[in-house]
Amino acid sequence: MYSFMGGGLFCAWVGTILLVVATATDHWMQYRLSGAFAHQGLWRYCLGTKCYLQTESIAYWNATRAFMILSSLCATSGIIMGIVAFAQQPTFTRLSRPFSAGIMFFASTFFVLLALAIYTGVTVSFLGRRFGDWRFSWSYILGWVALLMTFFAGIFYMCAYRMHECRRLSTPR
């Protein structure tokens, strides 16, 4: 059980760090604008070496930002629950700590999937036509890696929960 929780905690730490970095950085998309290199993130866009805040309130940016922040918060609370799961005495007999941590990591995975799906859909259908020479960049890719890490953290914690439940049910009362 503890090896699964340890693996889950490792994946969770890596996934949460990647979520925060992906959300905060400005390299979701790279393109050429009037022959100059440009890139944009969720909060700023940069032309050459000069960066500007994205002041427009565009729905897909707001949705992507909100879901990335929700994903980071779920992953952080999952880490806290995952650390507490190492404690021996459960405070609630009906609520398993590894199960709760696993659910939080799956919620984080769901939110980052929503954020990346929205961003991908709008970028490919609208911005891809606007900018001829463009590509997704490393911040966007970190978001997908974070999705995998939070998903595997949830899997590890669910495996730890199942092992604990099987042991609990097999011991005589």
From Swiss-Prot:
Glycan-linked positions: W43, W61
Cross-referenced Pfam families: PMP22_Claudin
Post-translational modification: Predominantly monophosphorylated on Ser-170. Only about 15% diphosphorylated on both Ser-170 and Thr-171.
Cytoplasmic topology ranges: 1-3, 88-98, 162-173
Record membrane topology: Multi-pass membrane protein
PANTHER family for this protein: EPITHELIAL MEMBRANE PROTEIN-RELATED (PTHR10671), LENS FIBER MEMBRANE INTRINSIC PROTEIN (PTHR10671:SF9)
TM ranges: 4-24, 67-87, 99-119, 141-161
Subcellular location as annotated: Membrane
Origin superkingdom: Eukaryota
InterPro entries assigned to the protein according to its UniProt record, in alphabetical order: LMIP, PMP-22/EMP/MP20-like, PMP22/EMP/MP20/Claudin, PMP22_EMP_MP20
One example of a Gene Ontology biological process annotation: lens development in camera-type eye
Extracellular side: 25-66, 120-140
Family: Belongs to the PMP-22/EMP/MP20 family.
Site (described: Not glycosylated): N62, W134
GO molecular function terms noted in the UniProt entry: structural constituent of eye lens
Function in brief: Present in the thicker 16-17 nm junctions of mammalian lens fiber cells, where it may contribute to cell junctional organization. Acts as a receptor for calmodulin. May play an important role in both lens development and cataractogenesis.
Name the record gives this protein: Lens fiber membrane intrinsic protein
Tissue: Eye lens specific.
Subunit structure, interactors included: Seems to be associated with itself or another lens membrane component via disulfide bonds.
GO cellular component: plasma membrane
Chief location bin: membrane
Keywords from the UniProt entry: Disulfide bond, Eye lens protein, Glycoprotein, Membrane, Phosphoprotein, Transmembrane, Transmembrane helix
Positions of modified residues (Phosphoserine): S170
Gene: LIM2
Native species: Bos taurus
Modified residue annotations for Phosphothreonine: T171
